Amino acid sequence: MAERSLLLVLHDVAPETWPDYRPFVEAVDALGEVPMTWLVVPDFHHRNPLEADEKFCKLLSRRVTRGDELALHGFYHYDDAPPPRTPGQYFMRRIYTWEGEFYALDHAEAKTRLAAGIELFRRRGWPLHGFV
């Protein structure tokens, strides 16, 4: 019989979302060592720069030390591109989600945002092995 395992992924991690996640993370921590992947948004919806909250950044650093993984999850996690022009684009960008940040970006802008997120992780000393 194979050993059982569990991987837990926390979506849209930012100082703004931490009050919702905190009780859940504390409950999971009480169960023992459950590895978590935190999908970190550097500036959630353009209103919540991660590095403006040093306490939260230190929390993420402690989680890395504990063995959790941080993954870059966009930069703003918000679709701020010009309005959609076709029914298909409208569905994908307004009905399905307003958070498809990279859906309408050109290569250069997508690369700029990814580079900014990668640089934030580098400054904080957080290993980065993925982007979701």
Please identify what each model-predicted range represents.
Residues 69-88:
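Short, solvent-exposed beta-strand-terminating loops
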Residues 1-69:
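Active-site beta->alpha N-cap acidic-glycine motif
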Residues 11, 73, 131:
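Conserved, mostly hydrophobic/aromatic
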Residues 84-105:
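Active-site gating loops and adjacent loop-to-helix segments of metal-dependent hydrolytic enzymes
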Residues 14-19, 72-75, 96-100:
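Short, mixed-charge, low-aromatic patches
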Residues 30-33, 88-91, 112-115:
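Short hydrophobic/aromatic-rich motifs at helix boundaries and adjacent loops
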Residues 101-132:
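Catalytic domains of cell-wall/extracellular-matrix polysaccharide-remodeling enzymes
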Residues 2-5, 36-40, 95-98, 119-124:
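A short alpha-helix capping/helix-coil boundary motif
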